[in-house]
């Protein structure tokens, strides 16, 4: 997992940005030449149940050859601590612009981009919209977004398997005129690493297609625990599949009892109205919370007069 080893330095490419050699992109990179081999007592506990091997049982909840559990925990704290500082900066910038930001996460092939383009079409031009698009390579998805008339900045992560808050902050610098608008961050297709990385978003939205299997929330619990909403996508295919919708929802709520679930299909239009209504409700709640905070600040200042 990326919180253990970090991602390849110098791989990130952001459209519209001049390349800066040696730019610190927000990840911690340890030098394997100086890693001490752990003593057996420090190694990741291995739990064996029949033919099942469980390596994620130690404090780090992961295993990396040559790294002790304590060292892995320290690396994770360093990486996520640095990322969280960038995320806080992003969140402050977004809030200053009254910009509502969603982080769309899923496995590859879940239909994120198709769902996003349909969402953009249905939202219309009532307020500013933009997309930050994450992929390891190519700008294919960003081109699809731009075809709708909405600006999109492509972030290529190279060997990196997720976006981090520093990448998003740099990509956001390429966008303008988003006051009071919506920003969608389409993360790299990956149900593991993006779960741990706050990008400064208001909500993580997990997209699970009915072609993937109903037990995905149990196999990748961190992602569904981190998400506030699960979009059960490609429901138009259900007549052709052996997919247990109720079991899938139950699994998601076993991991995260508070997760909201909406069944959607960009092709048939099922659930799209409910999805858009959820966006509007959450955006409104965010704005009202900010108004209340500003009023409280104003009252505190008035008390000083």
UniProtKB/Swiss-Prot annotation:
GO biological process, one term: protein maturation
Keyword Zinc-finger: no
Single annotated GO MF: nickel cation binding
Entry keywords, A to Z: GTP-binding, Hydrolase, Metal-binding, Nickel, Nucleotide-binding, Zinc
Organism: Azotobacter chroococcum mcd 1
Binding site for Ni(2+) 2: 161-162, 193
CDD domains from the UniProt entry: HypB
Record-given protein name: Hydrogenase maturation factor HypB
